[in-house]
């Protein structure tokens, strides 16, 4: 099963991707992680990406697509994958379709959450400075305020999670992603999921939607 998971910041993509990966026994591929791995391992594409990043420039599509393609060709992806964070543009989506021409995507899942709810979720998020574990002051608070349950690390709010920045991030995301949503809608593989339900209900809805596409 080859699935793309889409949704704005704060929609819970990471949580759902991990759950789906376990349930379907396919890898969760977060593009940020494979980028960092390619750079740290010093692969040809990783070196190329690093040269752009060091210069403060956007990494060109052909390099991004190359890094994703390298990962999708690994043996653990033969039975499928959950792709999180890619594609971000229609150009990237078209290139991905070419890469997957023999085994096309099963579904593109979009976790839909209202703007107000997303701002509430993002601005309440707190991260552990030591281990990076994520909490929420309202939905998933730590046992002791401001302290991580795992390692007693200090919890902090990321700069891009304050309310004003969260609003800006959402505007940019929604504007850039709309053409991608339409692209997968036109291809007949888009599945919109109500992301305002509990994580367990969202997971069940995603599972039902992707299994119906098999």
From Swiss-Prot:
- Gene3D superfamilies reported for this sequence: P-loop containing nucleotide triphosphate hydrolases (3.40.50.300)
Q: What is its main location?
A: cytoplasm
Q: PROSITE patterns, from UniProt?
A: ADENYLATE_KINASE
Which InterPro entries does this entry report, sorted A to Z?
Answer: Adenyl_kin_sub, Adenylat/UMP-CMP_kin, Adenylat_kinase_CS, Adenylate_kinase_lid-dom, P-loop_NTPase
For the ligand (ATP), the binding residues are: 10-15, 125, 134-135, 197
Q: Which UniProt keywords apply?
A: ATP-binding, Cytoplasm, Kinase, Metal-binding, Nucleotide biosynthesis, Nucleotide-binding, Transferase, Zinc
Q: What GO molecular-function term can you cite, just one?
A: zinc ion binding
**What processes in GO biological process is this protein linked to?**
AMP salvage
Annotated catalysed reactions? AMP + ATP = 2 ADP
**Where in or outside the cell?**
Cytoplasm
- The positions annotated for binding AMP are 31, 36, 57-59, 85-88, 92, 158, 169
Name the EC number(s): 2.7.4.3
Spell out the residue ranges making up region: NMP: 30-59
What ranges does the record give for the region LID, renumbered to this chain? 124-161
Quote the function comment for this protein.
Answer: Catalyzes the reversible transfer of the terminal phosphate group between ATP and AMP. Plays an important role in cellular energy homeostasis and in adenine nucleotide metabolism.
**Free-text comment on this protein's domains from its UniProt entry:** Consists of three domains, a large central CORE domain and two small peripheral domains, NMPbind and LID, which undergo movements during catalysis. The LID domain closes over the site of phosphoryl transfer upon ATP binding. Assembling and dissambling the active center during each catalytic cycle provides an effective means to prevent ATP hydrolysis. Some bacteria have evolved a zinc-coordinating structure that stabilizes the LID domain.
Family recorded in the similarity comment: Belongs to the adenylate kinase family.
- What is the annotated quaternary arrangement, including any partners? Monomer.
Please state what the protein is called: Adenylate kinase
UniProt source species: Natranaerobius thermophilus (strain ATCC BAA-1301 / DSM 18059 / JW/NM-WN-LF)
Name the gene: adk
């Amino acid at each position: 099963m080859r699935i793309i998971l889409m949704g704005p910041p704060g929609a819970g993509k990471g949580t759902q991707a991990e759950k789906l990966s376990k349930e379907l026994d396919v890898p969760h591929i977060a593009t940020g992680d494979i980028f960092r791995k390619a750079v740290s391992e010093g692969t040809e594409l990783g070196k190329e990406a690093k040269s752009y990043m060091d210069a403060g420039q956007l990494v060109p599509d052909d390099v991004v697509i190359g890094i994703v393609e390298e990962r999708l060709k690994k043996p653990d992806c033969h039975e499928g994958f959950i792709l999180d964070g890619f594609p971000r543009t229609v150009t990237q989506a078209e290139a991905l379709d070419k890469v997957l021409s023999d085994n096309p995507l099963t579904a593109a899942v979009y976790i839909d959450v209202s703007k107000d709810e997303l701002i509430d979720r993002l601005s309440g998020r707190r991260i552990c400075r030591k281990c990076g574990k994520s909490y929420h002051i309202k939905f998933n608070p730590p046992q002791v305020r401001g302290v991580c349950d795992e390692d007693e690390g200090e919890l902090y709010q990321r700069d891009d999670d304050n309310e004003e920045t969260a609003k800006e991030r959402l505007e940019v995301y929604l504007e850039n992603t709309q053409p991608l949503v339409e692209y997968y809608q036109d291809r007949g593989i888009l599945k919109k999921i109500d992301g305002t339900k509990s994580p367990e209900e969202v997971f069940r809805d995603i599972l039902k939607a992707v299994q119906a596409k098999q």
